[in-house]
Amino acid sequence: MPSKNDLLSFRSEINNIDKNIVQLLAKRKKLVLNIAESKIKNNQPIRDIEREKILLEKLTNLGKKNNLNTNYITRLFQLIIEESVLTQKKLLNKFCNDNNLDLASFSFLGPKGSYSHIAASQYAEQNFKTCIENACLSFNEVIQSVENNQTDYAVLPIENSCSGFINEIFDILKKTNLFIIGEINISINHCLLAIKKIELNKIKAVYSHPQPFQQCSYFIKKFPNWKIQYTNSTADAMKKIVKYNITTNAALGSELGSKIYGLKVLYKNLANKKKNITRFILLSRKPVSISSKIPTKTTLIFNTGQESGALAEVLLILKKNKLIMKKLTSQNIYKNPWEEMFYIDVQANLSSSLMQETLEKIGKITKFIKILGCYPSENITPIIP
């Protein structure tokens, strides 16, 4: 059995190996940027799927020879390849739009510690050197701050894997003149938080935004005596229970928020589905130009009126033009319940002749159509060896 000194020696060696791994990843990233510049210069696509497959196959075979699990090597290098693609996309976007990536300001539903704050921080970290944060009290205030030229970008949650599309955002998108210029997916870990450790049956009131209550409904139903208190955001809920300082109060919020507000985590991962992801969109006053070399989405809303089969015709146009629909949802039109407004994500670049032709055809059979934006797709399809 190894002695304590042996254990410390082994751990020290592992620490050195981990340090070398990080340094090699940093060196790899520099080479990736050189490759991206070469691709831009020679007008080459960001991804080379065949090369990625060959690379991953060689690495998994090398892993086998060194007694490493194939799944482990696959997952590790899928993540490394994904980071390489995102790095190249960022550089290409800067080239296409001549953007200053040093500083940007973001508005989000606050206060700090909300999931919108987390999304804004992660997007800013990926794309800018410095971020100025503006926490807002409502989604409308988030939009207005950008419309009024107070901040550069608005961050809004648009759909959740547990609770679906957020209708309040649908209403905002119909009215605003801003454009969707990006998206980011955030893993949501709803936690039950309190001022101090407390037994669940002693909790009297739980505070949070309506969405977490909906996403954690299975857990909440187990405690019918809890009084549900709705707040503007999860972070607002955390601030409230700190302010009230009542030990029988609790909040649904993020683990990051618990650290910001000094709360105790009673339970983690309370969502109805284990994989709970919220998709956020970024909006700006100006649309962005997206290279044809980048996987892209175009988002639009339209109203077919009361014409029978009009939606089917729209979908048929997409099918005939071999365009992939990534999302379709609808909402009844206020004061006219017999009509619906449709929201659709199409895997295509707005500037392509095929997409322009498609929009022209759709425009002829719809009552209303609005392009919300064209932007890089957040999801990088992983390579399977």
Curated annotation (Swiss-Prot):
The record marks 278 as: Essential for prephenate dehydratase activity. The regulatory domain shows changes in the ESRP sequence, which is involved in the allosteric binding of phenylalanine. These changes suggest the desensitization of the enzyme to inhibition by phenylalanine and would permit the overproduction of phenylalanine. One of its GO terms (cellular component) is cytoplasm. Substrate binds at residues 11, 28, 39, 48, 52, 84, 88. Catalyzes the Claisen rearrangement of chorismate to prephenate and the decarboxylation/dehydration of prephenate to phenylpyruvate. It comes from Buchnera aphidicola subsp. Schizaphis graminum (strain Sg). One of its GO terms (molecular function) is prephenate dehydratase activity. GO terms for biological process: chorismate metabolic process; L-phenylalanine biosynthetic process. SMART domains: CM_2. Residues 286-385 are annotated as: Regulatory. Pfam families: CM_2 (PF01817), PDT (PF00800). It comes from the Bacteria. This is Bifunctional chorismate mutase/prephenate dehydratase. Residues 299-376 form the ACT domain. It is found in: Cytoplasm. Its EC number is 5.4.99.5, 4.2.1.51. Residues 1-92 form the Chorismate mutase domain. Pathway: Amino-acid biosynthesis; L-phenylalanine biosynthesis; phenylpyruvate from prephenate: step 1/1; Metabolic intermediate biosynthesis; prephenate biosynthesis; prephenate from chorismate: step 1/1. Residues 105-285 form the Prephenate dehydratase domain. Keywords: Allosteric enzyme, Amino-acid biosynthesis, Aromatic amino acid biosynthesis, Cytoplasm, Isomerase, Lyase, Multifunctional enzyme, Phenylalanine biosynthesis.
